[in-house]
Amino acid sequence: MSLKLEVKTEIKLDYQGFQNQINEFHNRINDKNSPDINFLGWNNFPEVAINPQEIARMRKIVENLHQNSINVLVVIGIGGSYLGAKAALDFILGLGPFENKPEVIFLGNSLSSTDLYQKIEYLKTKNFAINVISKSGSTIEPAITFQILYQFLIDQIGEKLAKTRTFVTTSIKSGELLEIAKSNELEIFEVIESIGGRFSVLSSVGFFPLLFAKINVDEIIQGAIEAHKRYSTSSISQNLAYKYALFRFLMYKNFNYKTEILISYEPFLIYFNEWWKQLFGESEGKNLKGLFPASAIFTTDLHSLGQFIQDGSKNFFQTIIYIKKPKFDLGIKKIVQFNTKINKLSGKTVSEINFQAFLATTLAHSSYGNNPNLVLEIADSSPKTFGHLVMFFEKACAMSAYLLGVNPFDQPGVESYKNELAKNLGWDR
């Protein structure tokens, strides 16, 4: 898979002056004696992250579900427990709608009673299975949703059958969800202890929903393996993941930019952007440091944010993911009855015009708007490319956080709202 990185800014950047720091942090990421080794399972790829026996078991389970006309899987999880899988599905399949294909629905990622009610109403006419994903089982959003939905499934088909359609992805060492799964004889998939939620899509956390949707997981793994090898050097000039990390750091530290906007030109990348926001937001946003991760979809958001980006305050830079080959394309035909200027575009395709919009917008924002732009060009939106891109960003994120001087693998600030909510509810977490 080809990934190109191009910087579009008048700012002069000195990368080589940071090579010694990069070497130090590269060793910290890759050394088996690293002080962070208990959080680096995602980087020990595929040896730690991939369990071939578990994937084979998942394949058999999915095949059995499909043979029994169970064509809807409800994935219950929040944060890294669902964002990676949702990002992968949309990235690889597009947004549909799809007919006569397995459907994956995501719940447990909010406390909206309306959303939960409406999706349960939809499920009343469906044969569905449940995959609840939580390392501990004590996170309130998925815990509540699982309790309600599992009882709903029992009411629909009975407890005995409901147990055969409920799958638990959790820690195999301890936790409330593990105890529930064991006491109710539910199928268990492992959440690997050394892989944090936001780094977990390339593991059992992401694979079961993807297999259910008939995604080629082997190609995702292959793309990630290739990226892991490609970005295994500490050389800034040869490692684009580290070059991206250093670009971000310099924008923040040397030029006082406070926000990075990840921009895509395809709506099916909305949830990839959301996954990226969690990855960098939770990894870097601590000790009063870090770039604020924002996102936009162009050309849609040019009609809402375009004015601000062009002429507003200059406290942000843009990283653009551009996909060279679209999934599908449509030609524009001339309509004689339409005496409009659009007729002059007949003979072109929609993707050609989207590409020209990308070129024009990048030029306008970088040259006239004085916003630094970093362009990541990827070949396509295949499973292999998805795996590659995930590994690219995960490696870049770890390096970026180390450059910033923060721990990439904890998220202590998240506990504050959880603790206050528990107090409000009189709930012992």
From Swiss-Prot:
It catalyses: alpha-D-glucose 6-phosphate = beta-D-fructose 6-phosphate. It is an enzyme of class 5 (isomerase). Keywords: Cytoplasm, Gluconeogenesis, Glycolysis, Isomerase. GO terms for biological process: gluconeogenesis; glucose 6-phosphate metabolic process; glycolytic process. The keyword Cytoplasm applies. It is found in: Cytoplasm. The active site is at E282, H303, K418. One of its GO terms (cellular component) is cytosol. Belongs to the GPI family. This is Glucose-6-phosphate isomerase. The lineage of its organism: Bacteria, Bacillati, Mycoplasmatota, Mycoplasmoidales, Metamycoplasmataceae. The gene is pgi.
